[in-house]
Structure formats: structure tokens, C-alpha cells
Amino acid sequence: MPLLDSFKVDHTRMHAPAVRVAKTMTTPKGDTITVFDLRFCIPNKEILPEKGIHTLEHLFAGFMRDHLNGAGVEIIDISPMGCRTGFYMSLIGTPSEQQVADAWLASMQDVLNVKDQSKIPELNEYQCGTYLMHSLAEAQQIAQNVLARKVAVNRNGDLALDESLLNA
């Protein structure tokens, strides 16, 4: 099985919260797709709570689109990582890490402005596979943490995993 790009970076050297260009690719029609690693937690030291990450998934996708879409950028998807330390965001375009960081911080402020759980989008059994597994309070604590710590940039060159550690 091929080694995925996300496993070629040294997770012990990642900063969080931090944005990283995980991958870029060009479609046959010439569009650039960029995948960003939006790392909320320091790997193997912190983890996002399941209800909070789920609520954040519902809120973050819309708020990031509000702040980042336009001028050659269109978000395709924002999905939580299985390890619960962040999200992957795939988009058409090539925004800078700073543009993404600014949109992320603005989105976290938007999360703090949500007044109650009934305002979480798609919070019903028809649109959500686990609609009872939510916590606005946990999502807001995650947002507060990001705002307090700011958003750094993780660079692939700084995180390149030593080949001797691959499959260790």
C-alpha cells in the first residue's frame, strides 16, 4: 500500500494551532486543488473531544466558506481528522497560509457568537448521522483555545520525516 503524504511528516514537531499546505494538485482542466492541514491540537498530546469536534464540523464548514470563498478560492470540503487533532480542508485555488489562518480565526470568533445549540446547522436526524452527539460548549472551548493561542504555520520542509522512521 502506498505511503500517504500525511504520514511523511513528523507529527512530533508539529505546532498547533497551525495551518499547513498538505498537498496541491492540478486537475486535467488546469484547476489547482489545495489540501490544508488545519491542526487544532498538538499530536499525541491533545485531542479534540468527540462532541465538540462534531459540533465544530457543522459550524466550521459554513463559517470558513463565509470568510475564504471568493477571488479564485472555493472550498470543496472540510472534514475532521480521524485522530481528532484537526481538520483537512480541500479547496479549489491557492490561498496563502495567512489567508487561511485569518479565515480560521474569524471562523472561531463566529463559533463563539453562536448563542445556543438550536442554532447549529443540520442538527436533526435527517441531516446528521449522530445528531444527538453535539456540544456547543465544547466547540466554543475549542474556538477559545485557538483564539488564545493564535494560528502558526507548519511547513512541510520543517516536518519532513526522516526516512529511517518510516514504518518504524
Curated annotation (Swiss-Prot):
Record bears the keyword Metal-binding: yes
Biological processes per GO annotation: quorum sensing
Entry GO MF terms: iron ion binding; S-ribosylhomocysteine lyase activity
Cofactor(s) listed: Fe cation
Positions that bind Fe cation: 54, 58, 128
Keywords: Autoinducer synthesis, Iron, Lyase, Metal-binding, Quorum sensing
EC supergroup of this enzyme: lyase
Keyword flag Lyase: yes
EC number: 4.4.1.21
Entries under Pfam families matching the protein: LuxS (PF02664)
Superkingdom of source: Bacteria
SUPFAM superfamilies (alphabetical): LuxS/MPP-like metallohydrolase
Residues spanning the membrane: none
Reaction catalysed by this enzyme: S-(5-deoxy-D-ribos-5-yl)-L-homocysteine = (S)-4,5-dihydroxypentane-2,3-dione + L-homocysteine
Disulfide bonding pattern of the chain: none
Co-factor binding details: Binds 1 Fe cation per subunit.
InterPro entries noted in UniProt: LuxS_sf, Metalloenz_LuxS/M16, S-ribosylhomocysteinase
HAMAP family in UniProt: LuxS
Subunit (UniProt): Homodimer.
Family matches, as NCBIfam families: PRK02260.1-2
Summary of the function given for this chain in its UniProt record: Involved in the synthesis of autoinducer 2 (AI-2) which is secreted by bacteria and is used to communicate both the cell density and the metabolic potential of the environment. The regulation of gene expression in response to changes in cell density is called quorum sensing. Catalyzes the transformation of S-ribosylhomocysteine (RHC) to homocysteine (HC) and 4,5-dihydroxy-2,3-pentadione (DPD).
Family from the record: Belongs to the LuxS family.
Protein name: S-ribosylhomocysteine lyase
Organism: Neisseria gonorrhoeae (strain ATCC 700825 / FA 1090)
